[in-house]
Amino acid sequence: MDRTQKTEWVGSLQGTLGDVGLVVVTHYSGLTVAEMTDLRGKMRAAGASFKVTKNRLTKLALAGTEFESIADLFVGPTAIAVSRDPVAAAKVVADYAKANDKLKILGGSLGSLRLDVNGVKALATLPSLDELRGKLLGMLSTPATRIAGVLQAPAGQLARVLKAKADKDAA
């Protein structure tokens, strides 16, 4: 990589870091190409991305961002998982690390909050933003459904009483 390519790469990574809410730092030593491809596919499906990084250039890109506190994690063969959803990248990385011990989670950052390995794993157990929205929508619609049921009940009872009276008179 020549100097201009490095400058472009740092600028590109800074742009990416400006758009995301979560960065997870991992060691990927020993992963095969097929395993890396599989992990990247799972990341894309979750709305996240996984990128192998050059440590020195990544430290330059982190300078001046809210993720600056994790710069010391970039030692050895590192890769980053990033996502806008604060849970997506953590969930995929934690699940993949459970299944494949070659992927090691070093830590991460949720905005300006630095996370250790346990923090990333704890974040992975939380429901995603879409799941939370679904639960909230369900909670909001439940009272309306119950009110509609209560309002319909007296009319149904009245109809059954009238039908019983009509059946009795007919007999």
From Swiss-Prot:
UniProt name for this protein: Large ribosomal subunit protein uL10
GO CC annotation terms, alphabetical: large ribosomal subunit
MF-aspect GO terms: large ribosomal subunit rRNA binding; structural constituent of ribosome
Keyword vocabulary terms for this entry: Ribonucleoprotein, Ribosomal protein, RNA-binding, rRNA-binding
Taxonomic source organism: Paramagnetospirillum magneticum (strain ATCC 700264 / AMB-1)
GO biological process terms on file: translation
Pfam entry (one): Ribosomal_L10
Subunit structure: Part of the ribosomal stalk of the 50S ribosomal subunit. The N-terminus interacts with L11 and the large rRNA to form the base of the stalk. The C-terminus forms an elongated spine to which L12 dimers bind in a sequential fashion forming a multimeric L10(L12)X complex.
HAMAP family: Ribosomal_uL10
Free-text function comment from the UniProt entry: Forms part of the ribosomal stalk, playing a central role in the interaction of the ribosome with GTP-bound translation factors.
Similarity comment: Belongs to the universal ribosomal protein uL10 family.
